[in-house]
């Protein structure tokens, strides 16, 4: 019962602490001018401990990398199974990406930007060679969660990743250690599968994900949104000159 769960959590935490991430073949830098130095304004890179979470299960899965596998199957010419060591042999890259929850309210905190280290999903899918009639990938988590992602979003130039690192460290356990999906430009409900173990290449007219089966739209592109951080909500603003600062985002598309 609870003793087994706590023992498993301690074991996986120890494995994570001892893990050394591979060096990325490419990195993305954040311009120094992006940090404006305004007190109260959210930093460009969200600390991992402050990054938002949306969970659909009561228990956080504890997955040892030695036991992890990823199966790619469905409408493909060649089924592929990858283990942790296989994933590490592929060329990892680091990218800066913003994730946001579709249920983030105006002024809400369900958004974060991190440095993600991982293997491009397009390279993994290329090994399986999806058939011409496929248009969706149904990803599955070890806890049963599913997300339906447009195939083109996983294979274009947006650097959708099978992520293994976050902000220079192995993924936090609660954020999907050892492997999760990160897809810039899509809301999490159709892309951000944590503890991912399966990619089923399929079609929208044949399958649906956890949230789309509950009435949410199929493709979930991130829409333009903004937030005022300074002054904070409810703060008293004195007469005279005041600083107003915030953030805006539309990942993959960009804001100009």
Model-flagged regions — what are they?
Residues 1-11:
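N-terminal export signals
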Residues 10-256:
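Structured, non-membrane catalytic/scaffold regions adjacent to prosthetic-group chemistry
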């Amino acid at each position: 019962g609870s003793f087994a769960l706590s023992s498993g959590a301690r074991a996986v935490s120890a494995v994570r602490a001892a893990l050394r991430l591979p060096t990325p073949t490419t990195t993305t830098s954040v311009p120094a001018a992006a940090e404006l130095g305004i007190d109260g304004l959210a930093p460009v890179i969200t600390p991992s401990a402050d990054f938002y979470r949306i969970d659909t299960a009561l228990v956080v899965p504890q997955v040892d990398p030695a036991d992890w596998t990823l199966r790619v199957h469905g409408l493909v010419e060649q089924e592929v199974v990858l283990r942790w060591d296989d994933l590490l042999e592929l060329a990892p890259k680091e990218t800066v990406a913003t994730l946001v929850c579709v249920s983030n309210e105006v002024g809400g905190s369900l958004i974060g930007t991190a440095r993600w280290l991982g293997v491009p999903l397009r390279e993994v899918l290329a090994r399986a060679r999806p058939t011409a009639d496929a248009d969706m990938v149904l990803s599955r988590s070890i806890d049963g969660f599913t997300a339906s992602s447009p195939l083109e979003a996983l294979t274009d130039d947006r650097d959708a990743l099978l992520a293994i690192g976050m902000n220079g460290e192995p993924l936090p356990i609660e954020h999907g250690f050892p492997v999760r999906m990160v897809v810039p430009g899509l809301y999490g409900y159709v892309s951000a599968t944590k503890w991912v173990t399966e990619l089923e290449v399929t079609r929208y007219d044949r399958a649906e994900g956890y949230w789309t089966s509950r009435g949410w739209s199929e493709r979930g592109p991130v829409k333009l949104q903004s937030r005022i951080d300074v002054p904070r909500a409810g703060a008293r603003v004195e007469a005279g000159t005041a600083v107003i600062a915030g953030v805006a985002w539309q990942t993959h598309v960009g804001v100009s």
